[in-house]
Amino acid sequence: MLYPSIDALQRTIPSKYTIVTVAAKRARQIQDGKAPKVAEPKSYKPVGQALEELFSGDTTIIVNEKNNG
């Protein structure tokens, strides 16, 4: 079973698209050599570690809003 579950993640981040996008970007950083922010991740894969970081609140999401005016 996936930890954390998508339902648990959506309690803090309501958009599935945002969860997937942020987790993919953070997983790439982990894969490229950056250390995971979770002390003892349950997952050994970068995507799982990125999802654990999102769930724990260790990763900050910065939203860029385009100005259409």
Curated annotation (Swiss-Prot):
InterPro entries reported in the protein's UniProt record: DNA-dir_RNA_pol_omega, Pol_omega/Rpo6/RPB6, RPB6/omega-like_sf
Reaction it catalyzes: RNA(n) + a ribonucleoside 5'-triphosphate = RNA(n+1) + diphosphate
Entry GO MF terms: DNA binding; DNA-directed RNA polymerase activity
Subunit organization: The RNAP catalytic core consists of 2 alpha, 1 beta, 1 beta' and 1 omega subunit. When a sigma factor is associated with the core the holoenzyme is formed, which can initiate transcription.
Transcription listed as a keyword: yes
SMART domains, alphabetized: RNA_pol_Rpb6
Biological role stated in the UniProt entry: Promotes RNA polymerase assembly. Latches the N- and C-terminal regions of the beta' subunit thereby facilitating its interaction with the beta and alpha subunits.
HAMAP family the record matches: RNApol_bact_RpoZ
GO cellular component labels: DNA-directed RNA polymerase complex
Catalytic activity, EC: 2.7.7.6
Keyword presence, Nucleotidyltransferase: yes
UniProt KW keywords: DNA-directed RNA polymerase, Nucleotidyltransferase, Transcription, Transferase
Enzyme class per UniProt: transferase
Family: Belongs to the RNA polymerase subunit omega family.
Pfam families recorded: RNA_pol_Rpb6
Gene Ontology terms describing biological process: DNA-templated transcription
Protein name (Swiss-Prot/TrEMBL): DNA-directed RNA polymerase subunit omega
UniProt gene name: rpoZ
